Curated annotation (Swiss-Prot):
The gene is metAS. Its EC number is 2.3.1.46. The record marks S192 as: Important for substrate specificity. It comes from Yersinia enterocolitica serotype O:8 / biotype 1B (strain NCTC 13174 / 8081). It holds the Pfam family HTS. Pathway: Amino-acid biosynthesis; L-methionine biosynthesis via de novo pathway; O-succinyl-L-homoserine from L-homoserine: step 1/1. This is Homoserine O-succinyltransferase. The keyword Acyltransferase applies. It is an enzyme of class 2 (transferase). Keywords: Acyltransferase, Amino-acid biosynthesis, Cytoplasm, Methionine biosynthesis, Transferase. Gene3D superfamilies: 3.40.50.880. GO terms for cellular component: cytoplasm.
Length: 309
């Protein structure tokens, strides 16, 4: 889907250099169709980098997507210019009366922080509750999965002893599900987290459909039967060098990290890694947009679909 973004957003030139179709707001006004409204709650510190990653995955389809970037942390950012945040992000109070076709909640580097110590935890609770009445389908990614499972299902925070980092093999458990349509029987996907998502824990606490899992990484992709919420515990949006950057960052911080699994050639961090997960990342987001958002959402967002009640 050509994503519809402000003309001045840095992602426009960045993604066009990759031959990704980006439609600016000025051009979109000439097309007489209703774009899908997708809200992106960006919790990552390097917001511009994260914008580029998610907008790339949202861009590959003929329908328009009107992207609205959302922030909830009022503290001064160390990694993103204030001017960028002020120009391209809205506060929750600006949109709380609106309805959206989709909501994406990104990960956050909070794997070792208790929920009660997360500065914006009350805002997370508020937005997840708000989404039940104002969003057709919500996609949670990595840390946001752990937060949502706690808020929606009462699942306690599960933390691994060592960080799960690298490229892991996954098996498609339900190949006929809409969200996994077109998936290979096995495929690779990146993980970078302390959070633990055992399949047995999800089966104990929820009736969520577990669609993809990994012997090493646990549950990867699961969703509610009504398609209102979907969860991906890895990072299909990651650039080829994102894990390398995280590894070097942790080395510099003296954390003695393990080298990301199945990532650097011959486990040699001096060699450039190669991406092996992009196609399934694109397919996952395309399926979510099509089957969980576009096929269900009402044409007039002022009247949310009664099946969502």
């Amino acid at each position: 889907m050509p994503i519809r973004v402000p003309d001045e957003l840095p992602a426009v030139s960045f993604l066009r250099n990759e031959n990704v179709f980006v439609m600016t707001s000025s051009r979109a006004k000439t097309q007489e169709i209703r774009p899908l409204k997708v809200l992106v709650l960006n919790l990552m510190p390097k917001k511009i980098e994260t914008e580029n990653q998610f907008l790339r995955l949202l861009s590959n389809s003929p329908l328009q997507i009107d992207i609205q970037l959302l922030r909830i942390d009022s503290r001064e950012s160390k990694n993103t210019p204030a001017e960028h945040l002020n120009n391209f992000y809205c506060d929750f109070e600006d949109i709380q009366e609106q309805n959206f076709d989709g909501l994406i909640v990104t990960g956050a580097p909070l794997g070792l922080v208790d929920f009660c110590d997360v500065a914006y935890w009350p805002q997370i609770e508020r937005i997840i509750a708000w989404a039940k009445d104002h969003v057709t389908s919500t996609l949670f990614v990595c840390w946001a999965v752990q937060a949502a499972l706690n808020i929606l299902y009462g699942i306690p925070k599960m933390t691994r002893e060592t960080k799960l980092s690298g490229i892991y093999q996954h098996q498609t458990d339900k190949p006929l599900a809409l969200l996994t349509r077109g998936f290979d029987e096995t495929f690779l996907a990146p993980h970078s987290r302390y959070a633990d998502f055992p399949v047995e824990l999800l089966q104990q606490y929820t009736d969520l459909d577990i669609l993809v899992s990994s012997e090493e990484a646990g549950a990867y992709l699961f969703a509610s039967k009504d398609k209102r919420v979907a969860f991906v515990t890895g990072h299909p949006e990651y650039d080829v060098d994102t894990l390398a950057g995280e590894y070097q960052r942790d080395l510099a911080a003296g954390l003695n990290p393990q080298i990301p699994l199945n990532y650097f050639p011959n486990d040699d961090a001096s060699l450039p890694p190669k991406a092996s997960w992009r196609s399934h990342g694109h397919l996952l987001f395309a399926n979510w947009l099509n089957y969980y958002v576009y096929q269900i959402t009402p044409f007039d967002l002022r009247h949310m679909n009664p099946t969502l009640d």
